[in-house]
Amino acid sequence: MSYFTKLPAVLLLEDGTVFQGKAAGKIGTTTGEICFNTGMTGYQEIFTDPSYFGQIMVATNAHIGNYGIADAEVESGNIQIAGLVCKNYNIAYSRKQADESIQDYFQEQNIVGISDIDTRQLVRHIRDKGAMNAIISSEILDLEELKAKLSKVPSMDGLELSSKVSTKETYTFGDEKAAYRVAVLDLGVKKNILRNFDDRDVYAKVYPAKTTYAEMEKDFAPNGYFISNGPGDPSAMPYAVETVKEILANDKPMFGICLGHQLLALANDIPTKKMFNGHRGLNHPVKNIIINHCEVTSQ
């Protein structure tokens, strides 16, 4: 599909701010916590990253969909974001490796979005006011009706979401004859993390979020443990904190990324706090505590 009629759509924020735009993806209504990602490429990886489950993603890059969708570039089996907000929503694409258009992809997976709005103004608003709930609709344009629906959406604070995106069955990834064996506690792991394990001669076994240390140790006897990235509030995951504590108590090598890193902190009685605006993008500031400098890293 190269051309289609753009129907009107509306984005309503929790604080009452309204943006009028055009429908993108499936005609419908969606809700979630609105936030922005500053990556200039990799929109498909963003859509399918389980860490973004339940969030409406604003793309700061003006063009989305212009290089299509490739099956090989997903980070999970499904689109994880609740909705998309962008400036230019491109149905046509010009990359021979692509398998389909973003419009076909969104319609197949029932994703509602909005385009043709001033995303620079919106990002500044979120930057200044912080992340908040929002609603996108291309089927309901009455603001009072949308406000009523939005008022019923729960805050992301206190939500346990990892069990919704975690694998339901244990599976392996990589070469069984690899030099190392790592047990992965899947709280929303990205496929690229598993590919990186394989590239480094690691055979990984991936377990559902609520698997205990004893179950993983008995089943796999790994050289170490990895606590994955994922969505939701770490304080709402006492089961995972307990698993991390047991791994630490048994003096097993372990590391965590994203949510897993926060759980490692909680297991050591170090509290975590939600940032006013999270760092979502390709370049992340990291404080070098040795030289007391802030360095920009590519991740």
Predicted regions and their residues:
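Short Asp/Glu-rich motifs
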Residues: 125-126, 216-217, 266, 284
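Glycine-enriched alpha-helix->loop->beta-strand junction motifs that scaffold or abut catalytic
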Residues: 201-203, 220-224
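Residue-level signal for well-ordered alpha-helical positions
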Residues: 70, 196, 219, 267-270
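Cysteine-nucleophile active-site neighborhood
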Residues: 223-224, 229-298
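Short amphipathic alpha-helix with an adjacent loop that forms part of the alpha/beta core around
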Residues: 213-221
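Short gly/pro-enriched beta-turn/loop segments at secondary-structure junctions
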Residues: 177-180, 220, 249-250
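RNA-binding accessory domains that recognize and position tRNA/RNA substrates
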Residues: 1-214, 232-234
